[in-house]
């Protein structure tokens, strides 16, 4: 019998002046509508809405109702919690993904909002406008690429592979490798795929969209140390300044399973990012290559939907 498959979705219940969806949220809903057939294959979808104001029933119900309309699945469950600006997606990932390592389930973890958090950036001038458009398509290209080959992903995960993610190829396409363990992907992924990726600095580890085989992941990490924790202080360290653009929270919490020396090497990786802060962000971000061909059509989409 195949593993059951669940989708855990983190949603930011962001405060707003009027009770309506913003442009980013509308865009995400529009994308999910296109994937209704694939979405119906999930055994369960769990949506956790991290509210800026947990008591705001009107906003919670708006988000719940609008998201429900596009999630054509036999079992959809919603939950709300208080958003924590420091921990961000941790409020969802820790409890509903990380703490379930070892279960006989395949989990697709994603963010609802994607990378562009404010549609007003599309009214800005170049190059920032290009940058944010690229980021959006990088996110949704991965998202759609994962769901459209649902059976292929299942074959990989049910075969005992523990992590399924994405890398940018030099020919501007997305490659979807899998790894025997999270540790090997985090520490060796760059080396293994260095001939495929455009820039060794642009390592893409599991982040906003990733599949996990929770049972196989526990087996791959069976030698986990007794006491190795990434505490709130380290979360804060990674959340400050522009480094938050490069560090995925999902990656941080799975670091609990790494040896102390490995955590030091990850800290060094963060330090290396400090050295390139002066480099223009869009010059090093991989999405600009992956998504270049989509820019004109996305501009058209924004105009047609009155977002710009």
Task: Give residue ranges: language-model regions.
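ER/Golgi luminal nucleotide-sugar-dependent glycosyltransferases, focusing on the catalytic module
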Residues: 1-308
């Amino acid at each position: 019998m195949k593993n059951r498959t669940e989708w855990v979705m983190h949603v930011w219940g962001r405060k707003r002046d009027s009770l309506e969806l913003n442009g980013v949220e509308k865009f995400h809903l529009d994308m999910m509508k296109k994937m209704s057939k694939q979405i119906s294959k999930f055994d369960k979808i769990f949506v956790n809405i991290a509210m800026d104001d947990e008591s705001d029933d009107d906003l919670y119900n708006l988000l719940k109702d609008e998201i429900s309309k596009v999630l054509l699945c036999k079992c959809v469950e919603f939950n709300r919690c208080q958003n924590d600006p420091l921990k961000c997606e941790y409020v969802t990932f820790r409890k509903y993904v990380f703490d379930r390592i070892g279960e006989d389930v395949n989990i697709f973890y994603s963010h609802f909002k994607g990378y562009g958090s404010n549609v007003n950036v599309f009214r800005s001038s170049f190059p920032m406008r290009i940058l944010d458009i690229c980021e959006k398509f990088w996110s949704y290209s991965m998202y759609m690429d994962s769901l459209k080959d649902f059976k292929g992903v299942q074959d990989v995960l049910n075969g005992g592979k523990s992590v399924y993610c994405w890398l940018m190829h030099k020919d501007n396409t997305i490659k979807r490798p899998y790894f025997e363990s999270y540790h090997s992907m985090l520490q060796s992924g760059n080396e293994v795929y260095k001939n495929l990726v455009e820039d060794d600095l642009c390592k893409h580890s599991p982040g906003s969209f990733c599949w996990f085989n929770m049972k196989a992941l526990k087996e791959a990490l069976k030698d986990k140390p007794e006491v190795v924790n990434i505490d709130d202080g380290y979360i804060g360290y990674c959340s400050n300044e522009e480094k938050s653009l490069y560090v995925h929270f999902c990656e941080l919490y799975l670091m609990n399973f790494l040896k102390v020396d490995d955590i030091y090497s990850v800290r060094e990786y963060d330090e290396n990012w400090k050295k390139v802060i002066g480099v223009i962000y869009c010059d090093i971000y991989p999405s600009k290559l992956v998504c270049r061909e989509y820019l004109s059509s996305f501009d058209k989409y924004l105009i047609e939907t009155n977002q710009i």
